[in-house]
Every structure is written in structure tokens, then in C-alpha cells.
Amino acid sequence: MRVDKFLNAVCITKRRAIAEDMCRSGVVSINDNVVKASKEVRVGDTISIKFTTHTDSYKVLAVPTSKNVPKNAQSEFVEKL
């Protein structure tokens, strides 16, 4: 699954367009490598998002098969580090 779709599916971003913009701006990285929106996410990857005041990191536990995941099921797919 593409990183922009993944961020939207597991409710890290509200819209896929926001995730695409974040990737285009260079604030999203997987395993310490800045990535484009089309980068594939795999189980075990660490996704980091840089904000102006802090950085959020998430470990991918599973890749969802559906387009959207309920917010209460987010912990099945990502673990906040």
C-alpha cells in the first residue's frame, strides 16, 4: 500500500491529499529515508513525520486491506513510538 494511502487509511491524516502534500514537502520518512507518496509501506517499517515543534514516529504492525480503518482499530495497524 502506498504511504499516502496508508496514512489516510489508519487515520494519521484526515485526507489523502494532506498526506500527499506532506510527502511532497519532505516531512515524511520511512526508515530514516525521505519518501515520495508512491513509496510502498511494509510491515516492520518505521514512519516518521516531522512537524515544526516535534516528530511523530509510528511502527507499521500490519497493512490494512480496506480503504478505511475505524479509528478504534488503529492500534492493530500502527504503534506510536
Predicted regions and their residues:
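Short, charged beta-turn/beta-strand-edge "cap" motif at the junction between a beta-strand
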Residues: V34, T52-D56
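A basic, amphipathic helix-loop patch mediating RNA/tRNA/ribosome contacts
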Residues: M1-E40
